[in-house]
Design a protein with these regions (language model features):
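Tryptophan-paired
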Residues: 49-138, 197-201, 205-337, 373-384
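Sec-dependent bacterial lipoprotein signal peptides
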Residues: 1-16
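Short glycine/proline- and aromatic-enriched beta-strand/turn motifs that initiate or cap beta-hairpins
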Residues: 41-45
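Short, solvent-exposed beta-strand/turn "edge" segments of beta-rich domains on protein surfaces
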Residues: 188-193
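Intrinsic-disorder/low-complexity, polar/charged segments enriched in Ser/Thr/Lys/Arg/Asp/Glu/Gln
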Residues: 31-35, 104-106, 184-186, 197, ...
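Structured interaction patches on ligand/partner-binding surfaces of diverse proteins
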Residues: 94, 130-185, 309-341, 346
Length: 384
């Protein structure tokens, strides 16, 4: 009974199986078929309202691994040969698709239904090649358990900006067939991106700021450094980004449309690993944050001149001072969602980074799809 894999519509280059020795249109001789269908409607670029970029929808490779309990199940392909530790698919072999047509979204994996029945199917999209190599039976440092796979994928980032496209996507499901001999058995797997996307929009409400004359600086700090296959709560490691200049003032594309007629800047989108520290204290488990260093010209006679150190030359009316702010992220970030923070700078910051003024913001949480993810309704929430 041949295992097949069916993807929902993908707004990216589709992939085909690289396993050989079987007929793309399906087996002959009356054998059954199993469809492995990815619940990946979030990869569909529905229309112009879609909030994911083509790069975020990209599917270059797919790897399917079967586990029985905690242990990897080596599967003997129908096409012959030794048992394999995983089934691998790529975007370049369209001839392996049903009817030689990738739009069918179905590809056959040469495995018997009876061999995979009762296992857990783990699907990994855009898996790093170094991890894939360790899935092979007999590989050096072979991955043989779920825990080992989790640790292998949980790579530590060197900087926040290391999380780039194509994005890792994962999903798993229990394989339960009432009758493995039945034609067209199907496995449904809900696949999600393993990370979320963060956008920060700055509103320069305070009239002493000069974003049209001199751009400020921002730094992503204390972000979680590990990406996990399954859901993750704790922040087990942290990483910082580089101090970077804020972009020029610019028009904002939907859904980042400005609501106030004030100068705005949008920080570059950044991908962030999920976490949940909502039940912990801020003193022991602080939330990640964005540090802002924004130039402001205070002017002569401003009471703030006694708080901020004199700028170069001592002229508060012509030379800007550095004003520091913090945008503290929510204490829970869930994978496969897009978080848009609208932060308003309504007054002076601090003259020092360690005492940076915390900005309030409105937070919009959107699934990376046009349909809802449970727990997120796409409405706006106030950070207080």
């Amino acid at each position: 009974h041949t295992l097949t894999s069916a993807l929902l519509t993908v707004a990216a280059t589709l992939f085909g199986a690289c396993n050989k020795g079987y007929v793309p249109d399906g087996p002959t001789g009356g054998e059954g078929k199993i469809k492995l269908q990815f619940g990946a409607s979030d990869l569909v670029q529905h229309d112009t309202r879609g909030i994911a970029t083509p790069a975020e929808n990209t599917v270059n490779t797919v790897d399917v691994v079967f586990f029985r309990g905690q242990n990897k199940e080596a599967i003997t392909p129908n096409s012959g040969g030794a048992p394999v530790g995983s089934f691998h698919f790529e975007a370049t072999t369209v001839g392996d698709w049903v009817n030689n047509d990738p739009t069918t979204q179905t590809v056959y994996i040469p495995a018997k239904a009876s061999d995979v029945n009762g296992t857990t199917a783990v699907t990994l999209i855009n898996l790093p090649a170094s991890v894939r190599a360790r899935l092979a039976v007999g590989a050096t440092d072979e991955i043989t358990t779920v825990d080992q796979l989790t640790k292998a994928v949980s790579q530590t980032l060197a900087t926040v900006e290391d999380l780039t496209t194509p994005l890792l996507m994962t999903g798993q499901t229990n394989v339960t067939f009432t009758n493995p001999a039945t034609q067209d058995n199907k496995i449904d797997v809900n696949v999600k991106r393993a990370v979320s996307r963060l956008d920060v929009v700055l509103y320069y409400d305070w009239d002493k700021l000069i974003p049209n004359q001199q751009r400020g600086l921002y730094t992503f700090l204390q972000f979680p450094s590990k990406t996990f296959v399954g859901a993750n709560a704790d922040i087990t490691g942290r990483v910082d980004g580089a101090k970077t200049q804020v972009a020029d003032l610019t028009a904002q594309p939907a859904p980042l449309t400005a609501t106030d007629p004030v100068p705005t800047s949008e920080l570059p989108s950044v991908y962030i690993n999920e976490y949940d520290i909502s039940a912990k204290t801020a003193s022991t488990d602080p939330a990640p944050y964005v540090l802002l260093e924004l130039p402001a010209i205070l002017g002569d006679g401003n009471p703030l001149n006694g708080i901020f150190p004199p700028p170069a030359g001592g002229d508060f009316s012509t030379t800007p001072v550095k004003s520091y702010y913090k945008v503290i992220l929510p204490r829970k970030i869930e994978r496969n969602c897009r978080y848009v923070l609208h932060a308003h700078v309504v007054g002076p910051g601090s003259p020092t980074a360690d005492q940076a003024v915390v900005l309030q913001f409105t937070l919009t949480v959107r699934p990376w799809i046009e349909t809802n993810v449970p727990g997120f309704d796409g409405t706006t929430h106030e950070n207080i």
